[in-house]
């Protein structure tokens, strides 16, 4: 009898574990993306990219684990406090962060595991379809004026001094 009770408890534990941990795929995802990229390279050391999305699925799946792929690099996607809100961020050196469009491919757990497997086996990863893709337009970073303000102020000061000195010399002559 005790063996039967422990078997029943084990079966109940196994079934409850499977029901809580089964990942359901998102059907027909609808996204509302927004993004931010660093535009000023003078005050920052790296260009930062932040993508926020609001995700709703036709089958009402919530709190999915998502992963992002940007140019072959994968990043975990964090869930926001609000249901269906997600965010991913990454940074690049200013030299590497060229102006243009960055394609951010989002994967669920199943497709992400296929992506990682393909990478480990040196297979073509472009055949693995993402759950959805967000295009991030980066306009590049501003590196400051061509001439620093200190040099410009010194040059203007020298020109004013020269004009004042020549006017004084012309008046005294």
UniProtKB/Swiss-Prot annotation:
Membrane topology: Single-pass type I membrane protein
UniProt entry keywords in alphabetical sequence: Disulfide bond, Endoplasmic reticulum, Isopeptide bond, Membrane, Signal, Transmembrane, Transmembrane helix, Ubl conjugation
Membrane spanning residue stretches: 145-165
Cytoplasmic-side segments: 166-173
Disulfide bond sites: 26-57
Record-listed cross-link Glycyl lysine isopeptide (Lys-Gly) (interchain with G-Cter in ubiquitin), residues: 73
Stretch forming the signal peptide: 1-23
GO CC aspect terms: endomembrane system; Sec61 translocon complex
Subcellular location: Endoplasmic reticulum membrane
Entries under Pfam families matching the protein: TRAP-delta
Lumenal topological domain: 24-144
Family membership noted in the UniProt record: Belongs to the TRAP-delta family.
Subunit structure, as described in the record: Heterotetramer of TRAP-alpha, TRAP-beta, TRAP-delta and TRAP-gamma.
Function per UniProt: TRAP proteins are part of a complex whose function is to bind calcium to the ER membrane and thereby regulate the retention of ER resident proteins.
PANTHER family in UniProt: TRANSLOCON-ASSOCIATED PROTEIN SUBUNIT DELTA, TRANSLOCON-ASSOCIATED PROTEIN, DELTA SUBUNIT
The protein, known as: Translocon-associated protein subunit delta
Organism name: Rattus norvegicus
Record gene name: Ssr4
């Amino acid at each position: 009898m005790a063996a039967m009770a422990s078997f029943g408890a084990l079966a109940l534990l196994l079934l409850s574990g499977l029901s809580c941990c089964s990942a359901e795929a998102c059907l027909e995802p609808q996204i509302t993306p927004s993004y931010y990229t660093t535009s000023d390279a003078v005050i920052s050391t790296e260009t930062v990219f932040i993508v926020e999305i609001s995700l709703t699925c036709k089958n009402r799946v919530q709190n999915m684990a998502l992963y992002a792929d940007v140019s072959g690099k994968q990043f975990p996607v964090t869930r926001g406090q609000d249901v269906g809100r997600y965010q991913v961020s990454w940074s690049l050196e200013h030299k590497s962060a060229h102006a243009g469009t960055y394609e951010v491919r989002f994967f669920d757990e199943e497709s992400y595991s296929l992506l990682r497997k393909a990478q480990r086996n040196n297979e073509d990863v472009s055949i693995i379809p993402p759950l959805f893709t967000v295009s991030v337009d980066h306009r590049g970073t501003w590196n400051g004026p061509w001439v620093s303000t200190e040099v410009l102020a010194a040059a203007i000061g020298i020109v004013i001094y020269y004009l004042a000195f020549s006017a004084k010399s012309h008046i005294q002559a």
